[in-house]
Structure formats: C-alpha cells, structure tokens
Amino acid sequence: MPAAWRAVAAGRTARGVHCALQGAATCGACGRMTLCLCACAAATPTIDVLPLQELSMKLRYAVLPLCLLTALPSLAAARGFDVRDMVALDRVSSPTLSPDGSVLVFAKRQAKSSNGKPATGLWTRNLRTRDAAPPRRLTPDGWNVNSPALSPDGKTVYFLSSKSGTQQLYAQPLAGGAPQQLTAFAVDVDSYKLSPDGKRIAFSAGVFQDCGSNLGCTKSKLANLKNAKASGVVYDQLFVRHWDTWNDGRRNTLFVADLPAAGGKAVAGASAISATLAGDAPSKPFGGNDDYAWSPDGGSVVASVRVPQPHGPETGKKATVGAKPTGNDEPWQTNFDLYRLDAAGKAAPVNLTASNPAWDAGPVFSSDGKTLYYRAMKRPGFEADRFGLMAMDVASGKSREIAPKWDRSAGEIVLSADGASLYTSADDLGEHPLFKIDIASGQATKLVGEGSVHGPTLAGNTLAFTRNSLKSGDQVFVSDVQGQGLRAITQSAGELLPEVQFGDYEQFQFKGWNNDTVHGYVVKPYNYQEGKTYPVAFLIHGGPQGSFGNGWSNRWNPQTYAGQGYAVVMIDFHGSTGYGQEFTDAISQHWGDRPLEDLQKGWTAAQKQYGFLNGDKACALGASYGGYMVYWMAGNWNQPWKCLVDHDGVFDNRTMGYATEELWFSEWENGGTPWRNPAGYEKFNPVLHVDKWKVPMLVIHGQQDFRIPVEQGLAAFTALQRKGIDSKFLYFPDENHWVLKPDNSVLWHDTVNSWLKQHIGQ
C-alpha cells in the first residue's frame, strides 16, 4: 500500500486539499492530480478528508478503489491547451494596496459576465487573514472598470468606467456600497492620479489644445467633424497616423479637477495644465498615469512630454533663424523631458531635464518632495536604449544615476517606505524578475524570479504584483518587502484548467554569433513521451529588442502549439533584451546576419540537446521583426523548414522606411534615412531575395497596422502567388499590429494550426 494511502488508513486527516473542481485537484489519499472522493466538496475551495476510522469497515475499503476508479478517467482525459482556453481564462491586473498594506484590490477580466459579455471588475482581499477564502467582488457584476486606486485613508476605491456612456471617474466604499460617479466631463478620462490629499485628480484627456480648459469645445469640434459633408483631411506635418489611429488634431493633455464630496454632484469642469506644451501628455499610443506624478505638497505635477521642434527644408534639423519651418521632428526623435506643471495652471511649465537629449520617463517623488526619481536613456533616437535609474535633487536640479553598473533596463520605480531602496522589474536572462535597488550604493538584488513580474506596488510591509510564466497567465501575488512569504491570491492556469496538461519547458544555451553565449527555451508537447519525436514550431520574437522568455502571452503563446502536440523552440538572438545593453545593441544595422547566425546555431544546438525534436518536420513562425526574419529566412535559410508563418512582417525595408510612422525606429536600425543611406536599407532587404523563395508560407496582416502597413503583407503574398508557391493570406480589417479581439484570435490560431498540420502533421 502506498505511504499516502497508509496515512489515510491510519486515520490521519489531510488538511487543505484543493478540490478537484476548484483548482489543483490533489487527492488526499494518492497525492495525484486527479478527480477523487474530494470532488464531492466542490462548493468549498478547501476540504478535510475524514479519518477512515470514522467510516464503516465496508466503506473504508470502498474508498480506495473509488479513488482509483475516479483517477483513471481524469488521467485519460488530460488534453492540451488551446486558443479557446486562452481567450476564456480570467486575466488579472492592476494590484493596488491600501496605505497600510492590509487590503488588496485588483482588476479581473472575465470572458463572460452576467450579461454574457466580457467584463473587467474589481476584486478585493483582506491580507491580514490567512484563510483560503477567495477574493470578493467589489464592483457590480457586468460593469467594465479599470485603473483602481485607493484613497489616502484606505476606505474608498476609485476607478474608471464607461457606464455613463463616456469613460469617467467613480468611487465606491471599500466596505461595500454602490459606485458614485465623480466626474461628468464632456470627454473621456483616459488616465488619472489622485492628489496626495485625495481631494483632487490630475487626469489626461484627448483634446484640441486651442480649446484650453473648455472640454465642451473639443466635444463640439468632434461633432462638427463628424457632420461635415466632405470627408477629406489636409495634413501639413507628421504624424498623419500613429499605431492604429489617424491623427484628427487632438493631443493628450493633462488637467486638474477638484473631486466632489461624498454624495455630491459629479464635476464637469477642469483646468488644463499642459495645454501650452505642443506634445502629448502622456505620450501616444501607450502612455499612462506612470508618465506623471504629483509633488507631495500637491502644488505641481511632473510629466514626461516630448515637445516637437520645428525643422527646416531637407536638413531634418531645427530650423535656422528666419527659415520657414516645413514640419516638426516628432516622428523621428525620442527626446521626452520631465516638465514641472503648475497644478493651478497659472505658472509656465519648467523643463527639468533639458540637458538630456534622450528619453526621460516615469517620475516618482520621495515622500518629502526633495528628490525626484525617474528613468532615463542616454542616446537620442534609440527607443531600445537602457533605462537607467536616476535621482534628481529638486532644489539644485542636479541628477545622478543610482546604479550605473547594473546592466539592465529598469521597468518602473516603486519606493520603499523608508526611502532607502527602490523596486523595479527588468528583463534578465530570459525572465522578468523583481529587483530591489539600494539607492545609496546602487546594489541590485533579485527578489522574485521564476517567471515575469509586472505591476509591483508597495504599502506598509507588503509587496503586491502579478507574475506569470510559460505555464500560467498572470496571478496576483503578495510578499513582504524582501520578497519572502510569497503568497498567491489568484489561481494559476493549471488550477483554472485542471483537465489541461501543459508542456514542460527548459532553458538552454549555446555559443552564437561572436562566440557569445545565447539563450533559448524548449517547450515539450503536452503529450510528451520519452523516446518519441515531435514536429517543431520554431518561434521568432519581434521587437527586435524583445525576448521570448519565461512569460505568458495572450498572443504568441508557445503552449498553444505544445497543446497541439508540437515541440517549441525559441531563441533570444543578439538584439534581445535582458542580457546586457551591448547584446541588445548588436542587432542595429545587422538585422539579417548576427540574429540569423544565432537562430541557425540555436536550431542546431537544440536538436543536439533534445532528441525529441524532429528536425525533418519543422515550421518557422514570427511576427513584426520575427516576421521580417521569416521573409529573410525564406530567401537565405529555407532548407530546414516545411512551412513558414509570417505575421505583420517587414517585406521591403526601403518602403518600410517611408511608410511606417515612428521614423526614429527605421532610421536608427538602418543607419539613417532611406535617401541618405539607401545601402543600409538594402543590405538585409528580404524583397531582394524573393527569387530564392520556395517554402510554403502563410501571411497574416491587419488593416489597422500603421507600424508595418498591410501593403507589406500584400506584397509578400503577391510574390508567393506569382511564383506559384503554396501560400495563404489571412487578412483582418479590424486589427492593428496585434490580434486582440477574442474571435479573431481563435481564427488566427485555427488558421495557423491548420497550416502547420497540413505541412508537418499533428
């Protein structure tokens, strides 16, 4: 008899066994992840297994065979993870703590709410209790909310919702009660931050800046544009469009507004504080409330803003005195500066970081207001430069780098209560851990790893954050300020899907370009058996300054391939992040040689180290830069591949340099503009190697992708069809550079999996 069974037979109670229908289905008798007798207690998250001496002798001997019988179907029913699981999983985000760290609030998106539609609500958990009670829903079922924040006294939670028809700010007692609408502005509130005393908000909204503080003016102008008989728009400068949106003249602008008293009428007026700056605050398209911060005294707001400068004909430089500007340099410069904005909107903005021509971001004040912490790059025009951690003495305006020897790019800044340390996450050797940085010495200590940590926040002695891995989407975790006592507040993907078997993964390394150490990951198929071989999905990440590491993606998720019976190989080639800035820099102006050498050597090394990889049945897949590499490989390294999948890739470098919107990217990566350095664009241009294409290819592109316009995909498909190569084109009229809509994601994965099955089986 197994030891676990003897323990049960001896009458010892197994406590804290998770019910099979609620999460990790661990049987108290056999210790297996199976459906067992404990499944009958599905109504509670934890149960006690009764000592068998309390049962009759006949029942005692009946229990163990029952456990065996119920275990077998569970094991046999194990299946792989697929896209329908992925889009149906809950998604948690935005952990927020009360000031004393005793209460946690977080957002959870559910695929189906009470009205049958996806909805994101707020949930809360008392962290002072150690029971297994699940988090409690805070906001009403069916409401869509985001951006939670807690009041200074910890009694009220604030959030944004479009319940009224436009996105406005709401408040709700943490103890329970109905939400109260606090703002009734004529435009959407895009982001906000509470003032230190909780009586005001700084918020951002997209407005016409000549409207000043009159929010109704923007609403009227938009109505006039909508009702105009002619649809044409005349532009005299860039951006014409950005990411997935055409420029209609609005700028993200910061405002300050008083909040009404409890039960008071929603406020409709606000004072613009950044309208005199001809830039977006926060930046488009992804800026948020981490781009601005209140001073502790509430007298000012510091914001990261890129202010475009005029330029003269042909030079691409600032206009000379007397020269007529022909546009502005916003699309090809990354000079974001920190501006101090008067919260009353009276004093002129002050540039605090004018001496740095590169990117300054993420301002955070010390509690006494004497020090301003922020992140800064050093090289203008390079979006993937290292973000160093900076400390500015507010009185003198002098700054110093806190950890100059720490060769990682900081993701955010969270200050410790005593002001002696800060917390930040960063890519690091194929993961994204949480680090603690000593402000005086610059010493960096990794606190939480084993996956990817995001959204850290600190209050009292409590850290809260989300963490994910190659086997699970985000979970909310809490720990002490040293990263100890780690506790999961929400369930993992495995607990939410007990019938799913996820593919195991392992990191490996090899010598790549320049004999440097290069890292990669291999994910086994869900149904892996020793001695068998499996077809391979070879995934190539985008960026190119990015990483395919130990993290979860709701778009490019290796488990969706492992769940179909494929092994997965991913290589962090030169240019990837988390291996030092020199490693990241190595790809610029070398898109087609150094990374390709890493991919080639990585593919060889993976096959040598993992005998279950069937190198004769392999397809390569990539998006964005990964899509560029797929096009490049089609003409320069097509021998190993039975098929290729290209999503939103660069097909023609030269036309990309003219058609993309963020010109600084193409100009940095190719060594200048297409007319000044045409050789830089043609050196590794996939379009010049179409004559060698022969491998079947699936091309995917979205109409709203203005980063790599749809014509790139159409041109590639035209070449494939004209050459008579087996090919398909999957087109999304309503998606941008990413496929975000759940139904479209299902179609994307079904089409890709069908393509793989056609060419390498499974």
Residues covered by each model-derived region:
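A flexible loop/linker signature enriched in serine peptidases of the S9 family
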Residues: 108-121, 139-146, 158-170, 184-190, ...
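Short loop/turn segments that connect beta-strands within beta-propeller blades
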Residues: 127-130, 173-177, 259-262, 342-346, ...
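Active-site-proximal cap/loop segments of hydrolase catalytic domains
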Residues: 557, 562-563, 570-762
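Non-catalytic accessory segments flanking enzyme active sites
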Residues: 96, 202-204, 227, 231-236, ...
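Short beta-strand element of the alpha/beta-hydrolase
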Residues: 532-542
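Residue-level detector of Asp-centered blade-edge/turn motifs that repeat once per structural unit
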Residues: 99-100, 152-153, 196-197, 296-297, ...
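Hydrophobic beta-strand positions that form the internal "hydrophobic ladder"
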Residues: 101-104, 154-157, 201, 301, ...
